[in-house]
Amino acid sequence: MIGIIDYGRGNLRSVEKALWKLGYPAKVLESPAELMAVKGIILPGVGAFADAMAALEEKGWIQPLIHYAHSGMPFLGICLGMQVLFEVGEEHGEHKGLGLLPGRVVRFPAGRKIPHMGWNTLHQEKPCRLLEGIPDEAYFYFVHSYYVASEEQEILAGMSDYGVPFPALVGRDNVWGAQFHPEKSSPWGLKLLENFGKWVNEDATVSSHRS
């Protein structure tokens, strides 16, 4: 079972529907106590960085999410859910993120229409399990005004460009994030969600064999 975190800032039902369509059971989690019942989680999100962190704090999600990330189980952030994985966001002042990945979330420079909205290509920087079966320069759907700035090359799996190059798929170990919306990016976004579902199933199988 894949859990989708409900903190009042995400496109929950479309992600849930996409996973079920792909054959991967999913449920929306309304409280941290439900984390124990799932083998992987997705943190969606739309809106402002500061509002998202405030909502996560208000609903008691922050420490449970950090603990879950450290447990080694698959964790995927989508759009704003990817951005809050990082250390600091600069939207409406400087705000602390979850700190699971190194970097800052900054505004696109002037000169381009903001938000960056629509289809854009993903240039694959390195192989990763989420990109298995997806061609280089495949198109994905984006909606965002801020982007991640990180000097940690190791976490950059895919890049896109909107006046400046920006990380579109990031991660290491079990914590990953997609700046685009895979649930709106058929067919390749659904392939990425399928790869995540396979990873969750494989990880759960390995864990059950160990126990």
Curated annotation (Swiss-Prot):
Pathway(s): Amino-acid biosynthesis; L-histidine biosynthesis; L-histidine from 5-phospho-alpha-D-ribose 1-diphosphate: step 5/9
One function term, GO molecular function aspect: lyase activity
InterPro entries named among the record's database cross-references: Class_I_gatase-like (IPR029062), GATASE (IPR017926), Imidazole-glycPsynth_HisH (IPR010139)
GO cellular component terms, A-Z: cytoplasm
PROSITE patterns associated with the record: GATASE_TYPE_1 (PS51273)
Keywords noted in UniProt: Amino-acid biosynthesis, Cytoplasm, Glutamine amidotransferase, Histidine biosynthesis, Hydrolase, Lyase
Compartments (UniProt record): Cytoplasm
Database matches in Gene3D superfamilies: 3.40.50.880
Superkingdom in the source lineage: Bacteria
Biological process terms in GO annotation: L-histidine biosynthetic process
The Glutamine amidotransferase type-1 domain, residue ranges: 1-206
Active site: 79, 181, 183
Entry EC number(s): 4.3.2.10, 3.5.1.2
Catalytic activity: 5-[(5-phospho-1-deoxy-D-ribulos-1-ylimino)methylamino]-1-(5-phospho-beta-D-ribosyl)imidazole-4-carboxamide + L-glutamine = D-erythro-1-(imidazol-4-yl)glycerol 3-phosphate + 5-amino-1-(5-phospho-beta-D-ribosyl)imidazole-4-carboxamide + L-glutamate + H(+); L-glutamine + H2O = L-glutamate + NH4(+)
Description of how the protein assembles with itself and partners: Heterodimer of HisH and HisF.
Protein role: IGPS catalyzes the conversion of PRFAR and glutamine to IGP, AICAR and glutamate. The HisH subunit catalyzes the hydrolysis of glutamine to glutamate and ammonia as part of the synthesis of IGP and AICAR. The resulting ammonia molecule is channeled to the active site of HisF.
Stated name of the protein: Imidazole glycerol phosphate synthase subunit HisH
Organism: Desulfitobacterium hafniense (strain Y51)
Gene that this polypeptide is encoded by: hisH
